[in-house]
Amino acid sequence: MAGATGGNVPSLADLQQYAVNRSGAAEAVRQTLYDWQLYPTAGINQLSFFQNPIGQGVTSTNGAVAGSAKTKSDTNMTLSGQLPNPQAFLVESIEVFFLAGSTATANTYAVFNPAQVIPVGTQILADQELDQVSVLNCGYLDFFIGSKSYLTESPLFSFPGKTGISVESAFATNSATTDALFTVNARSVGRPYYLDPKISLMATQNFNITLNWPVAIPTPSGFNGRIGIKLDGILFRNSQ
C-alpha cells in the first residue's frame, strides 16, 4: 500500500517484528553500558569500571550529595561486573570521556564553566582543558573478561566519544583597559574505536575495564574531574 509520500506502509505482519509484547520471545535493542567515576585532583594509578552498580559506590553526578551512592546518572549496571540472567550484550565500540570540574572537595564533582574572563594586560591558560589533555594523553585501557584481557590500548584519547558538548567561540581585543571574555572547550576527536570482531558479554560473565596510569596524573586546574566509559552495542533480553 502506498503512503502519502509515495513510500510503502508496513503491513500488520511487518509491524509485529517491532512489537514489545511477545511472550516467551527475546528482543534486541540498541543500548550502551555506561559507568562514570570521580577523577581526584591528585590523580590515581587505576580506576576500575562496571564494578559498582546502582545503589553502590560513590556518585560523580554534578550537584549530588557528596559521598552518596551511584544512581542511573552514573551507571546502568544492576550487578557488580556482570549482566543479570537472561541478558547478554554485544559490544561494538568503546568510548572514554573526561569532564573537567570546578571543585576540589572530596567525593564531589561540580561542572566546569568554559567561559572565562582575561584580566587586563594578562595572559592565562585554560587549566581545566589541560586536565583532559593531561589525563587522556597517557595511560592505557584494559578490557578484561573472565580470566584474560581482550583489549589493551594506549593512550586514552584513542577512544573518542561519538557525542559531546562543543563550545566553539573566541574573542580578542587590543584594548589596554578592558577585560576580555573568552570560551574554550576540548574533547577527544577522531574515528570511534570499533571492535573488530565484536565481543559478546553473556549473562553472569564477569568483566571489567580498567584505566591505568604509570604514575598518578594530577589535574593542572587543581579540581576534581569526572571520567566515564561507554560500551556501545546491542542488549539482548527477554521480551515482555
Where are these regions (language model features)?
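Beta-strand-centric surfaces of beta-sandwich/beta-rich domains
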Residues: 1-240
